[in-house]
Amino acid sequence: MPRVVEVGHRQVFALLLAVSITAGACGVDVAVTATRSQQSDSTTTSLSTEPVPDDSNSAPAVDPSPTEEPDIAITAPIVVEADAINFGPNKPTRDYDDFLLATVSDLDSWWELTYPKIYGAPWQPLQGDVYAAYPERPDDLPGCGEPRTSYDDVQQFVAFYCGLGDFIVYDDGEDGLLADLADNLGAATIGIVLAHEYGHAIQQRSGVLDQNLPTVTTEQQADCFAGAWAGRAARNEGAVSFTDADVGAGLIAMLEVRDPVGLDQFSPGGHGSGFDRVGAFQAGFVEGPIRCSGLIDDPLPLVPNQFNDFADQQNEGNAPFGYDAGEPGVRNAELFGFLVPDLNLFWGVDVAIPGWTDLTLVPVQQIEDATCDNLLPGFRNGAALCPSENTVYLNEPVALDLYQQQTFGDFSLGYLIGLAWAEAAQIALGSTRSGEDRQLVNDCLTGAWVRSVIPVNRELPQPRDERRTSVVSPGDLDEAIRTAIIIGDSGNDDNVLGSPFEKIDAFSDGVVGGIDACGA
């Protein structure tokens, strides 16, 4: 899986932080924005990780090798065209130039075969080019509503598809976001960005861009198409081949081009949260481009991305680190002061597992401080269950480090202790699952608990025990899947905790489908 998983946790934190800092200029697709009407009404809700006043037969594990639609594949060798990208006269050589030529050649060949099977019409190649933009390039980039596109324009958007001239431009500058992604995660990330922009070219040809849809809807489909192409690359079906690391890098890239936390994703230019974008990418990767074509009429569900109140906005959706349960009816509890009782009430009362015993969270500084003769694995990652004591031991130094990282936060810890509670639920249910299968069920069950704290139209799902006070903040689910990436197995064949792709997929199954999706 991604190279960031193959290094130490602190190196992962540093890498994700570095990428996040450079991701402020999230790619906005010019033509998509220009051809879409604004939508002011939204069903998204304002959320808070703080407590709110008292006033949902097969395991979810999915092998990330895409298998749903292998019929749409090119078996003939793909010719890599030397002019597939308009590099211009003064382009500095990049290590990934040949890879991108192969990517664009492969995308053209793939859509030449795939588009007619989905839409019943022949594929029309781009009327314009795929342009590399860089500071040294002469002023020869076509405009999108203007006579010319400047390099400063491209830097703002990172990459875009323009329907007016039917062309794509990407930032090839040495100091741009794409160069940073390639340096940190590999050139596959730029290939996925170009596959996303090709997705908008598909929408231009299929008439989707004429429907005045919310931007987030068309972005979701483009993410899905990018995932479908990445699945093709992972199957080694074309001119580009992806490794586990490349696929994992794609997941991280989707996280890094999410909407800012607190932004209504239905606002003009909205692309969706990291959880939304990763989910669309995975849907395409696993199920293929036909699945993506249906997302316009039947979009994937979106998680809310707006703050609940000014206080939540001020703390950026992060509850204070600590264990104090606060005062009844007053929103002053610390993180574990409301997460622990919420987990116990969910499993013991709302789910009502027979024989459930509430768990206690005990913070310790090192594993030697855990007085348990049957401590389960997980302490190194942050939390581990002691079944004989009905106790979850929290690795407080690791937990505090995660909490303080800019790209993680409070719900990284909610996810980690949620896994321990999910394991206790499997024990109480008498589950006989083992190994990776069992761990992925824990991911799914944790997602099912998370589903119960996501408001729908500003109301938490019912029925629920009235003493439960947890509710997610925008960005919380992104923090959870970031954490899944750093604790997951390095490759798909390790089969211990599940690869990052598998863990995120299982977690998402629980969030979307509830406990019934987990097969526990």
Where are the regions a protein language model picked out?
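C-terminal motif of bacterial Sec signal peptides marking the signal peptidase cleavage site
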Residues: 22-25
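Bacterial signal peptide processing site
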Residues: 27-30
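Extracellular mucin-like PTS domains
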Residues: 34-68
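Pan-zinc metallopeptidase signature
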Residues: 73-75, 260-350, 489-520
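Short helix/loop segments within enzyme catalytic domains
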Residues: 115-116, 217-219, 223-260, 337, ...
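Catalytic zinc-binding patch centered on the HExxH motif and its immediate surroundings
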Residues: 135-169, 365-393
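Short pre-active-site segment immediately N-terminal to the catalytic Zn-binding motif
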Residues: 174-192, 210-214, 396-415, 430-437
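Catalytic Zn2+-binding segment of zinc metalloproteases
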Residues: 197-213, 230-234, 420-436, 449-455
